[in-house]
UniProtKB/Swiss-Prot annotation:
Protein name according to UniProt: Methionine--tRNA ligase
Organism encoding this protein: Haloquadratum walsbyi (strain DSM 16790 / HBSQ001)
Top-level taxonomic group: Archaea
HAMAP family linked: Met_tRNA_synth_type1
Keywords noted in UniProt: Aminoacyl-tRNA synthetase, ATP-binding, Cytoplasm, Ligase, Metal-binding, Nucleotide-binding, Protein biosynthesis, RNA-binding, tRNA-binding, Zinc
Region (Disordered): 1-25, 309-329, 591-629
A GO term for molecular function: methionine-tRNA ligase activity
Co-factor note (free text): Binds 1 zinc ion per subunit.
Bias (Polar residues): 1-22, 616-629
'HIGH' region, short sequence motif: residues: 36-46
Coiled coil (UniProt feature): none
Composition bias, Acidic residues: 599-611
Length: 741
């Protein structure tokens, strides 16, 4: 952290109030994933959000929470229209082709949506018109004349991606609706400077045109209170405050196009893609309910807030505190949005404003994933710098391996890097060496020695250990930590390996009660691991379930099954995971390097995201999601080299974290420095999920004077960048204690 942050952390303390019931609740839950643009092929960087959503949905169901997991393809918007025109096909046929591809690809990776629709289907078109009509009737939509980019040579209006230019806020090159190369801000029509048509390459001109606006500014008070209630990852909770607490601008919700959902009573305008795209969450839930029956899942109970809609006056910035209280804000279900962090603004400002004004349930939580890099650099589909989803499968790797890597390789909101060498290391050491090794050796030994599970009671100590793992799993769900959900099973497997190794049952005779007890405990541990690991590695869990001779479907059992006695007889198992040879890594790394084309400009990665995951070029690159932070000027005063040498900067590994009582921003961090452990106090609690930091490599100032902060001794300083406290780390795996020079 900076010295300013360090000083402020010593001065500030705030408290939080938990307002929502923990999962599982009696209300229906809807878990959604950001809609992928039906615009190109999927690579593994795109899959992080969808794997995370699938894991979280499965985990909720495991706890007994009534849950619908839904998403769909985004068929509309200018990127689809632009690319369809380049291919000489209609936008609908272009988008449908990619939609059908996604319908095939997601299940191949164990991503099992309860419903996967698309924004151009009849259900979503009707639902969109219904909600927009509700906004109009409530007085939240008005007409305004604005400047709109126009190409005289093409005789065409230029909405969104049909125009490029300069961002008025930071001066970077930008698209018509987004500063994608600079500050990341959403741009309204008419804002972009020096506009250029992407159709002809000519300079565009601005002409006045009437468009429809949604009065987001009238909901500023509501949005501020909504953010106070919002759960999820800390980036989704904190990033929107700068927008909501600033000068909130109304939102242009129409475009001059013929591809999209028509604006009511005006066939010359279509709705902006960010209006109809999130409504697909509701439409997809409705389709699911219609398929299974409302007795199984009632979509209205999940999505509808209160009868009717709020009028402009009752839901405006003049809302009373009573109108914004949690008791009458949210009368529907538990809505959890799982997205990429580049679309936080849409899901925490525009979308909840629409829902609230139209009388629908506000989101309970938004979980925003970090980006994924590929061997330290951004994915670039235009340069073929990517590991494609179909390529991963064609190389013979099981989807569960990638699911585990994406779920547990860092916290969900943190950026993570994919490399074939790191992938091999995680698979061989953790899946093969820890989880697979324990389950295989336990089941094999029990099958050979006892034909299955010894007929003795589970020991109290192992039962308590499984209960602890169940508690950790449940806590992970309620803390919105995908990593913690996966770690619960892995830590139980680590315990199992230590347990069987300590007791060495192979040295005992079959009539020794101790041998029977140890193997009874180990088989129960194996079953518990399968139950807890199913959300992360569903296919592997299914195999363990079958190897145990269990009946029924492991994908539908409750978490309490982890403590139900396993069958007494089963056959010898097969090995769960296979090691990846080092030569495979060399082969795959070389294959990637050989095919990557030279960059055409200074950018290492393409960026093209609109309603979720834009797969035409790429998403999840390493650029900042907003870059709206003001950069401090570089200090004029210099220090000499001797002064710099006085700083003892060390690589450290975080081994323990906990919040400091009565200090909302402070956390106690214990780090391993190789030769000793140190305790630090850091003001990062509101910016990071503390559990996700365990095992992270960081940089600290090791020779800073000790300080007492909120009664806790701090022996060093954790270094981080910017207001979001982006923790400094090393590119390679430097050992704890390594000096930084």
């Amino acid at each position: 952290m900076t010295m300013k942050q360090y000083t402020m952390s010593k001065m500030n303390a705030e408290t939080q109030t938990q307002t929502r019931e923990s999962f599982p609740t009696d209300d229906p839950a809807v878990v959604t994933c950001g809609l992928p643009y039906a615009n190109g092929d999927l690579h593994i960087g795109h899959l992080r959000t969808y794997v995370g959503g699938d894991i979280f949905s499965r985990a909720l169901k495991r706890l007994g929470q009534e849950t619908a997991f839904v998403s769909g393809s985004d068929m509309h918007g200018t990127p689809v229209a632009v690319n369809a025109a380049e291919e000489g096909v209609t936008p609908e046929s272009f988008a449908l082709r990619h939609h059908e591809q996604y319908e095939t690809t997601f299940p191949q990776f164990g991503i099992e949506f309860d419903n996967y629709g698309h924004t151009h289907d009849e259900t979503n078109v009707e639902m969109t018109r219904e909600i927009v009509e509700a906004l109009i009737q409530a007085g939240y939509v008005y007409e305004r004349e604005i400047p709109v980019a126009y190409d005289p040579a093409a005789d065409q209006w230029l909405p969104d991606r049909f125009v490029n230019g300069t961002c008025p806020y930071c001066g970077a090159h930008a698209r018509g609706d987004e500063c994608d190369e600079g500050c990341g801000r959403h741009l309204e029509p008419g804002e972009i400077e020096t506009p250029v048509s992407t159709i002809t390459g000519n300079d565009a001109e601005y002409r006045r045109r009437e468009h429809q606006f949604f009065a987001v500014s009238e909901l500023q008070s509501y949005l501020s209170s909504f953010l106070d209630r919002l759960e999820g990852t800390t980036n989704a909770q904190n990033q929107p405050r700068e927008w909501v607490e600033g000068e909130l601008q109304d939102w242009c919700i129409t475009r001059d196009m013929d591809w999209g959902v028509d604006y009511p009573d005006d066939n010359d305008l279509v709705l902006y893609v960010w209006v109809d795209a999130p409504i697909e969450y509701i439409s997809s839930t409705k389709q699911y309910a219609e398929r299974v029956g409302t007795d199984s899942f009632d979509w209205k109970n999940a999505w509808r807030d209160i009868p009717g809609v709020r009028s402009h006056s009752s839901s405006s910035a003049k809302d009373s505190s009573e109108g914004n209280s949690p008791s009458n804000i949210n009368n529907g279900g538990e809505i959890i949005h799982i997205i990429g962090r580049d679309i936080i603004q849409h899901h925490t400002v525009f979308w909840p404003a629409m829902l609230h004004a139209a009388g629908y349930t506000e989101p309970r939580a938004v979980m925003a994933s970090g980006f994924i890099t590929l061997e330290g650099k951004g994915f670039s589909t235009s340069r073929n710098r990517a590991v494609w989803a179909d390529e991963y499968l064609a190389e013979g790797f099981h989807p569960d391996l990638l699911r585990y890597y994406l779920a547990t390789n860092g916290g969900f909101q943190q950026d993570v890097d994919f490399s074939w060498s790191r992938f091999r290391e995680r698979v061989n050491n953790e899946l093969v060496g820890t989880v697979g090794n324990f389950i295989y050796r336990s089941l094999l030994f029990a099958a050979r020695e006892f034909d299955g599970t010894p007929d003795v009671a589970l020991s109290d100590s192992v039962e308590e250990r499984i209960e602890t793992a169940i508690d950790a799993f449940t806590a992970g769900v309620n803390e919105y930590s995908v990593r913690a959900v996966g770690d619960a099973a892995v830590k139980l497997a680590q315990f199992g390996n230590e347990y069987i190794q300590h007791h060495e049952p192979w040295k005992l005779s079959n009539d020794d009660p101790q041998k029977q007890q140890v193997m009874r405990d180990c088989i129960q541990l194996a079953k518990a691991i399968a139950v807890l690991f199913e959300p992360v590695t569903p296919a592997a869990a299914e195999r363990v379930w079958a190897d145990l001779g269990e009946s029924g479907d492991i994908h539908t059992v409750g978490i309490e099954s982890a403590l139900v006695a396993p069958p007494q007889t089963f056959d010898e198992p097969t090995e769960l995971f296979e090691k990846i040879p080092e030569e495979r890594v060399d082969e795959l790394t070389a294959k990637l390097a050989d095919r990557v084309t030279d960059p055409t400009d200074d950018d290492d990665s393409d960026t093209d995201t609109e309603t979720g995951t834009d797969v035409a070029e790429t998403t999840n690159e390493s650029h900042s999601e907003s870059n709206m932070t003001e950069i401090d000027p570089i200090a004029d005063e210099r220090i000499d080299f001797e002064e710099f040498e006085e700083l003892d900067l060390r690589v450290a590994e975080i081994i323990e974290t906990e919040p400091i009582e009565d200090a909302d921003k402070l956390a106690r961090i214990v780090v391993d420095l190789g030769i000793e452990q140190r305790q630090l106090v850091a003001g990062i609690r509101q910016l990071h999920d503390l559990d996700d930091l365990i095992g992270e490599t960081v940089v600290i100032v090791a020779n800073l004077e000790k300080a007492e902060i909120f009664g806790v001794e701090s022996n060093g300083m954790l270094l981080a960048a910017g207001a979001d406290a982006d923790l400094l780390t090393t590119r390679e795996d430097a050992d704890p204690g390594t000096s930084i020079q």
